[in-house]
A protein has these predicted regions:
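Charged DNA-binding/catalytic regions of mobile-element recombinases
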Residues: 1-297
Length: 297
């Protein structure tokens, strides 16, 4: 509006234009003076100018998925003092918003009831140390060349993704590869007392998968098929993945494109993404704090 008045003031004058627009001449002159000499702008406007640059930097650095609360938390971590309300106001003024999480799709084909492991978790997705409880799940992604499937194994303690795999097939090999990656990544920290929890998917109840858990000394736990609450933490991470990567950056051309995006996102998620349930720190940092405290205990 200020620009419109400036563009037409020589022809019509400021006051006549303001008379038909919802703006007072004094407001226009104040804004115009601030444009000509930024030092004459209000203290709040000058603070917003500085904050606007920092908000955009954080927003871009974190894949443009953070909302006002998480942007504010990241600014505080970096030592930039700002109240939460101004962060939200500046973001709204720029039309910048975080992504809205959707739900993950149910992909489970359940196995027969006979002989499945007991539910050792009972919807209590808490752990007091790393390698105490893992949860596993997978979802599907539509690409131009057909569906591909993405599996995760997540350590509940810090919500860290310890294994993942992208495949064109839903066969057992696919989720078994994600498990193998998790076992390899965590083998140096000990797997004693570890519980692996999943839904009743045929892949997770297969003989090969069960044997691999047994070989590694991992106790299996299985919830009820089709009930998201029985694998709520895995569903939560999967929903983040679908919202922050798949739905936002699609459509997808190929398995390779999904695989590269997943690799990039998992690294960012583990190393940099702030997670509210663990105190607004990244999973890797939360784990590092645990090991530091354990070393001096």
């Amino acid at each position: 509006m200020v620009r419109f008045i400036t563009d037409h003031r020589d022809e019509y004058g400021v006051e006549p234009i303001c008379a038909v627009l919802p703006i007072a001449p004094s407001t226009y002159h104040r804004h115009r003076a601030g444009q000509i000499d930024p030092a004459r702008r209000s203290a709040r406007a000058q603070r917003d100018d500085v904050l606007r640059v920092e908000i955009q930097r954080v927003y871009d650095a974190h894949h443009q998925v953070y909302g006002p609360r998480t942007v504010w938390k990241q600014l505080r971590r970096e030592g930039i003092r700002a109240a939460r309300c101004p962060v939200g106001r500046v973001m709204r003024g720029r039309g910048v918003a975080g992504v809205v999480r959707g739900r993950a799709w149910i992909t489970t084909t359940h196995a027969a009831d006979g002989g499945r492991p007991a539910d050792l978790v009972d919807r209590q997705f808490v752990a007091t140390r790393p390698n105490q409880l893992w949860v596993a799940d997978f979802t599907y992604v539509a690409t131009w060349s057909g569906f591909v499937y993405v599996a995760f194994v997540i350590d509940v303690f810090a919500h860290r993704i310890v294994g993942w795999r992208v495949s064109a097939s839903m066969r057992t090999d696919f989720v078994l590869d994600a498990l193998e990656q998790a076992i390899y990544a965590r083998s140096g920290t000990g797997l004693t007392g570890l519980v692996h929890h999943s839904d009743r998917g045929t892949q997770y109840l297969s003989m090969r998968y069960s044997d691999r858990l047994a070989d590694a000394g991992i106790a299996p736990s299985v919830g009820s098929q089709g009930d998201a609450f029985d694998n709520a933490l895995a569903e939560s991470v999967m929903a983040l993945f679908m919202t922050e990567v798949i739905r936002r950056r699609g459509p997808w051309r190929s398995l390779e494109a999904v695989e590269f995006a997943t690799l990039e996102w998992v690294d960012w998620f583990n190393m940099r993404r702030l997670l509210g349930p663990i105190g607004d720190v990244p999973p890797a940092e939360f784990e590092a704090q645990y090991y530091q405290q354990a070393a001096v205990a």
